[in-house]
Amino acid sequence: MPTINQLVRKGRITPEEKSKSRALHSCPQRRGVCLQVMTRTPKKPNSALRKVAKVRLTNGEEVIAYIGGEGHNLQEHSIVLVRGGRVKDLPGVRYHIVRGALDCLGVDKRRQGRSKYGAKRPKAAAK
């Protein structure tokens, strides 16, 4: 335990908080190029084929990002926008691809929660 005099001279250092999305380098989003589009299986007890993409960001880092929503148009060399946000049942997937931005189309026929999937407001039905 330090003495008061030692604390006056040196002070205490507070540990720096590490970001959960380090590859973005303190930016809200980053642009990137899809290197590979694949499916991954989640941890127990879940079962599915989750769609993910390996993306090389503009800062040179390679990350694995989740493609949300039903169906997508991504393939190799697609330009995508990547945001932070992990997928709890996919180990190593700490990023999301933004739907409706750059080459990634929004989810069509989406009625609720449209803003999260880049879906436009549907036209009102004719009376």
Swiss-Prot record:
Function of the protein = With S4 and S5 plays an important role in translational accuracy.
Q: Which residues carry this modification: 3-methylthioaspartic acid?
A: D89
Write one Gene Ontology MF term: rRNA binding
The organism's lineage is: Bacteria, Pseudomonadati, Verrucomicrobiota, Verrucomicrobiia, Verrucomicrobiales
**Protein name, UniProt field:** Small ribosomal subunit protein uS12
Asked whether the UniProt record includes Ribosomal protein among its keywords, one would answer yes
Organism listed in the record:
Akkermansia muciniphila (strain ATCC BAA-835 / DSM 22959 / JCM 33894 / BCRC 81048 / CCUG 64013 / CIP 107961 / Muc)
CDD domains in the record, alphabetically? Ribosomal_S12
- Protein family (similarity comment): Belongs to the universal ribosomal protein uS12 family.
From which domain of life does this come? Answer: Bacteria
**GO CC terms, sorted:** small ribosomal subunit
Q: Which UniProt keywords apply?
A: Methylation, Ribonucleoprotein, Ribosomal protein, RNA-binding, rRNA-binding, tRNA-binding
Q: Does the keyword RNA-binding apply?
A: yes
Which is a GO BP term held by this UniProt record?
Answer: translation
Per UniProt, subunit arrangement is: Part of the 30S ribosomal subunit. Contacts proteins S8 and S17. May interact with IF1 in the 30S initiation complex.
